[in-house]
């Protein structure tokens, strides 16, 4: 009976508190019919080893365990397969390849999209994602994956004042040299602190805010790369804004961009202690946006997987829609990441502009602006490198 009880306890994964001698006695008295003496002795010896191991091992962990800790990883990839028509791999094709690779580990394409927060496809092929340690080990075994390593560029946000992020020491030194050289030859300021309106949603990620700031600055500078290298500090949790290196003329233009509260000289350059709070003398973007009247909106920051049906459902509550048009790449037949929305009335367009700017659709924070000309349907903004100005993820250090 004791042996049977010990056997049941072992099968249930519980520790057995019994002496080896007692177990030996029980094992010898167990009747196992239809077995040869040799097989019976072998099973008795195995029973003794299991019981002894169970008696000496610590109790098992509770059934309810904490969720696995997720860390940030940089995944270095081989060059994605060349397009059917030849030529360079486009951004959309590279992102699709990264998502498909990660989805093989996570089991869901949607989950893979949400986990990727940074990507590179121009010259080097890699992406950054937030997954647990076990998933990172599985990912390292996937075909086409060269390496999976911790994302050491990410700095603990608790070490930053006001939850801001600054440059690396090397880059900060380069900017300091630029300040010194510029000050000796000109009295003009080129380092600015930009206060931004709070997004229209309660929860956003750091990567989404970086995208938002980059797209805002792109409206003045004209291309993605210049916007990325100009930003040297961001704030994104309690107060919203960024610091950038631009000339005074661009700073004046930036102050008139939708969502910008103010543009001031960065009087505390070289330090992470920035004042993004401002005061009551700054303009009210609420009042500015309330005066906007437009039927036609330009939406950027869309996920490549957002459909016109999803976009229509998001914008329809503000009024009757005339058109919802996502601009597609003619070769890949995939979304370019931006769209045009048109309402029957200016009131509906103005309400949608105010409410939808900064909202999250399919995990991506969108930017909504007034559509200036219909020609933009045919000619999207391009950077000097020839790539669309739609931002995927910033590739500069943000902490």
Swiss-Prot record:
SMART domains in the record: RRM
Start and end residues of each RRM domain: 295-373
Transit peptide: 1-52
Subcellular location: Plastid, Chloroplast
Transmembrane segments: none
Gene3D superfamilies membership: 3.30.70.330, Peptidase S8 propeptide/proteinase inhibitor I9
Gene Ontology terms, MF aspect: RNA binding
Domain of life: Eukaryota
Name assigned to this protein: Organelle RRM domain-containing protein 1, chloroplastic
Gene: ORRM1
Annotated region described as Disordered, given as residue ranges: 377-399
InterPro entries named in the record: MORF/ORRM1/DAG-like (IPR039206), MORF/ORRM1/DAG-like_MORF (IPR054059), Nucleotide-bd_a/b_plait_sf (IPR012677), RBD_domain_sf (IPR035979), RRM_dom (IPR000504), S8pro/Inhibitor_I9_sf (IPR037045)
Pfam families referenced in this protein's UniProt entry, alphabetically: MORF_dom (PF21864), RRM_1 (PF00076)
GO biological process, one term: cytidine to uridine editing
Keyword entries, A-Z: Chloroplast, mRNA processing, Plastid, RNA-binding, Transit peptide
Function noted in UniProt: Involved in C-to-U editing of chloroplastic RNA. Functions as major chloroplastic editing factor. Controls a majority of the chloroplastic editing sites.
């Amino acid at each position: 009976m004791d042996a049977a009880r010990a056997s049941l306890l072992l099968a249930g994964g519980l520790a057995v508190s019994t002496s080896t001698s007692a177990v030996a006695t029980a094992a010898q008295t167990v009747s196992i019919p239809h077995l040869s003496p040799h097989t019976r002795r072998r099973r008795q010896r195995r029973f003794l080893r299991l019981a002894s191991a169970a008696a000496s091992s610590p109790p098992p962990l509770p059934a309810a365990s904490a969720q696995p800790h997720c860390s940030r990883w940089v995944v270095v990839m081989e060059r994605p397969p060349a397009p059917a028509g030849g030529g360079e791999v486009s951004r959309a094709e590279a992102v699709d390849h990264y998502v498909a690779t990660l989805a093989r580990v996570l089991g869901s394409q949607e989950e893979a999209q949400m986990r990727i927060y940074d990507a590179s496809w121009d010259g080097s092929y890699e992406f950054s994602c937030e997954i647990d340690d076990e998933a990172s080990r599985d990912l390292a075994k996937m075909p086409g994956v060269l390496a999976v390593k911790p994302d050491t560029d990410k700095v603990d946000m608790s070490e930053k004042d006001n939850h801001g992020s600054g440059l690396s020491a090397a880059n900060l030194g380069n900017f300091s040299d630029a300040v010194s050289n510029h000050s000796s030859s000109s009295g003009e300021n080129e380092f600015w602190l930009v206060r931004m309106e709070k997004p229209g949603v309660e929860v956003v990620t750091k990567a989404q805010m970086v995208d938002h700031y980059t797209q805002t600055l792109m409206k003045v500078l004209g291309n993605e790369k210049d916007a990325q290298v100009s930003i040297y500090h961001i704030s994104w949790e309690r107060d919203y804004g960024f610091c950038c290196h631009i000339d005074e003329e661009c700073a004046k233009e930036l102050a008139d961009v939708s969502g910008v509260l103010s543009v001031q000289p960065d009087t505390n350059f070289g330090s992470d202690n920035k004042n993004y709070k401002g005061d009551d003398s700054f303009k009210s973007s609420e009042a500015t946006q309330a005066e906007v009247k437009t039927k036609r909106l330009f939406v950027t920051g869309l996920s490549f997987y957002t459909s016109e049906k999803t976009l229509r459902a998001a914008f329809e509550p503000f009024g009757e829609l005339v058109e919802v048009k996502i601009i597609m790449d003619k070769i890949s037949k995939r979304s370019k990441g931006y769209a045009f929305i048109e309402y029957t009335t200016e009131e509906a367009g103005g309400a949608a502009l105010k409410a939808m700017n900064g909202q999250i659709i399919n995990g991506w924070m969108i930017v909504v602006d007034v559509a200036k000309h219909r020609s933009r349907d045919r000619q999207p903004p391009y950077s000097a490198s020839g790539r669309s100005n739609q931002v995927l993820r910033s590739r500069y250090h943000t902490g």
